[in-house]
Amino acid sequence: MIEVRGLTMRYGRTVAVDDLTFTVKPGLVTGFLGPNGAGKSTTMRAVLGLEIPAAGEALVDGHAYASLRRPMRTMGALLDAGAVHGGRTARAHLGCLARSNGIDSRRVAAVLDQVGLAEVADRRIGGFSLGMKQRLGIAAALLGDPAVLMFDEPLNGLDPEGIRWIRDLLRSLAGEGRTVLLSSHLMNELALTAEHVVVIGRGRLIADTPTGALAAQFQRDVLVRSADPERLAEILRAHGVSVAPEDASDTGMHGTGMHGTGGLFVRGMDAAEIGELALRAGIALRELTPRSASLEEAFMELTEDSVEYGAGPAARSAAVSEVAR
């Protein structure tokens, strides 16, 4: 596991990480989220022993990473894909890492093949694209066949095929029982990849929860379609709930309101209660769908007061409208 306990990081008067505590467990891909300046990269550097905490600790399998004799066999990490010697070949770069950690040289060829760089293994890294460097960084993280893996923005520079590849790779690694921590600003990808999320803002923990549960906290409404929407709307309003007709902009259908789609957006009553009410009234339902926020929307709401540089109200309102479409 990765354990962060009461971690505090200070730079002069600035508190970058503030008494942060969370655990990254094996068998899951855990997303590590936060706005720019939230302290994500600082926390990951502390896990690797690259930053000295003012208080608290960050442990890998119960030990400080710097105390491990062969650290790459315990934990693999990618923080900066560009932090490589451009004059070396991919094979030579991984070979040096392997020798430094007592790793069999045969692993070099294996991980180069695994990340799709076997054909360019003897090319100098300085000529690699960002996506190729990301793949090389991932190969380095996998080199020691570690049980714990940590990646900071590994999707940067990858094309759609590469993004799908790493999504499948991370899931398969977690499926083998490994611990996987993934930091990324690509919310749609995290929603598809991460089963658990840790959200921080201004260095403090905001949420530590399953991905689905986070979105469910921000349930917007229930979409209801029935054969008699006007009567159902009247009954629902009589029970004190908010009812709005579904218009064409929400469905892509022609026509508006209840006459156009038969859809209602209901707030203040859950799906089960709406279904029971419709049953008692003898109204057949065609659809009953709770609509929760996306991971991106939930993240924006959670971190609204934690952003380092925020847009003005007008721009923020426009951005939220775009997300909701």
Where is each model-derived feature located?
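ABC transporter nucleotide-binding domain
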Residues: I166-V266
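Short, flexible cytosolic linker that couples an ABC transmembrane/permease module to its adjacent nucleotide-binding
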Residues: A110, G212-A216, G312-A314
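ABC transporter nucleotide-binding domains
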Residues: I2-V4, M9-G201, A207
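C-terminal coupling/interaction segments
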Residues: R267-R325
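Conserved NTP-handling cores and scaffolds of large molecular machines
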Residues: N101, G177, G240, S292, ...
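Hydrophobic C-terminal alpha-helix "anchor/cap" residues
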Residues: L142, L236-R237, A278
